Amino acid sequence: MDYTAFCKNFFSATNIPVSLLKSGNPVYSALGEVLGLSVTTHWTMFPYRKNPEFCAISPDLEFGRVFIEGTEYDLIVGPAFSVPVTDQLVRQFMKEVAVPLNFRELLTEILCSMPQISHLQFARYLAFLHQCLNGKVVEPNEIF
């Protein structure tokens, strides 16, 4: 499967950012592509406890992770917001992912255009992605 094309199509269909990592190294980033940033920072990936799983930075700033079994790839989904995007959330996100300040206005516009989704809806997206990528069904409530 062409995982990069899959990520691009997911972002295009949902407007929820997604990144593809191979052994913790960025292969694709939807936000990086939109912002015109080269994403080269290595992510230290902790062993997953569940697949898929939540990776929350704060209660209002969530990511999800789907390990693509039998490969070295991880799909990082998000950020996802269950509350309206505020300046504080934008600043927090920029700090967490080291986005330069000169991208703040464009990033704010992008983040504000993303759908606001509940934790349960986000879990449903992760379960769907897990089924698509790994051929396994997981109930959204099992992700919590």
Labelled PLM ranges:
Residues 18-20, 75, 129:
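Generic structural hydrophobic/aromatic packing signal, biased to beta-strands
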Residues 1-64:
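Structured interaction and signal-relay segments at domain junctions
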Residues 1-3, 10, 77-144:
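Juxtadomain coupling helices with adjacent low-complexity linkers
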Residues 53-68, 72-77, 82-92:
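A short beta-strand signature within small-molecule sensing/ligand-binding domains used
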